[in-house]
Amino acid sequence: MSVSVLSPTRALGGVSGLLQVVSLLGLVLLLLKVAQLYLHRQWLLKALHQFPSPPSHWFYGHKKEFQQESELPLLLKRVEKYPKACARWLWGTSALVSVYDPDYMKMVLGRSDPKPQRTYKYLNSWIGTGLLLLEGQKWFQHRRMLTPAFHYDILKAYVGLMANSVRVMLDKWEELVSQDSHLEIFGHVSLMTLDTIMKCAFSHQGSVQTDRCSDQGEEVSPAEGGRAGEGEEKEDLGLPRHPPLCQSKYGLPCRDHLDQMPYTTMCIKEALRLYPPIPVIGRELSKPITFPDGRSLPAGILVSLSFYGLHHNPTVWPNPEVFDPSRFAPGSTRHSHAFLPFSGGSR
């Protein structure tokens, strides 16, 4: 009698053969992926050979180094050792070039390279696709629409409101400091910012810094009509609702005095140099680039523009850790791209 086609022995043999085929295909795909990663690493090594960096591990790059030490101190060490730029290996097959030289900055920001979506996509869920993440034509359109709203003449009406919000915060600080020498300011500054936005953008009456939480979503329409900030234009920056002080020769400063306070402007710029609001941005090169010193990078390389590193570069700013407002004194000269607290060029 012949053996049945559906016998258990033949069925097991069929399953075993299928597993062998699947295992073989998986092994082939794995080898192809390993070869692809190897070739990509070799391409990166060749592309970045002109940009030295500290020794890195073949698999996890410089990750261990950055895990053992804080990011900023380590960055400053690299800025001092490699004054213009250096390579940073994120993984064995992923790397970028960190730039903190004004000539390099000018070259990259003068182009229209796209933002690296593999990095910026994680910001979408946090801040949304706004002006910071837009690029190309959409960025130009949104920028063109928003720029008139931030014209100096329009912002004049809101100076009093902004100063009022800051004053409320400072009063709270005085009370808290008298109780404890330690004060965490982040939450207070965030609430002050919300207070300013509520007053200027939505004409909210009151202060979210002092109101109860249940009151913060109440009436936001103007009580007396007119635009937000109307009636505040003549307030001084130190004590609102006292116009005579603003008019006094030795009174507290008001909005009209801002242009006559060069040292205050110097201090603000020096603070922005030490602590830039935008510490770093990224660009993915869409075409090769050659820098003024002859070094070059091919298309596809990720470039990290470190404004924090630029502002703390001793070859650009002598004694960069010292707070020295005289760096921005009228008549002082510097590279056009040595001071970039809010980035520069097209987005």
What are these regions (language model features)?
Residues 2-30, 89-97, 153-164, 174-199, ...:
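Cytochrome P450
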Residues 47-51, 65-68, 134, 150-158, ...:
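Conserved, non-catalytic sequence blocks in retroelement Pol enzymes and Pol-derived host proteins
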Residues 305-332:
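Conserved cytochrome P450 K-helix/beta-meander segment immediately N-terminal to the heme-binding cysteine loop
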Residues 2-137, 141, 160-172, 338:
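N-terminal membrane-proximal hinge/A-helix region immediately C-terminal to the signal-anchor transmembrane segment
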Residues 74, 151, 178, 210-251, ...:
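Conserved cytochrome P450 catalytic core segment spanning the I/J/K helices
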Residues 63-83, 213, 217, 245-295, ...:
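Conserved cytochrome P450 K-helix E-x-x-R motif and the immediately C-terminal K′/meander segment
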Residues 193, 197, 201-202, 210-216, ...:
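Central I-helix of cytochrome P450 enzymes
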Residues 148, 329-347:
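Cytochrome P450 heme-thiolate "Cys pocket" and heme-binding signature region
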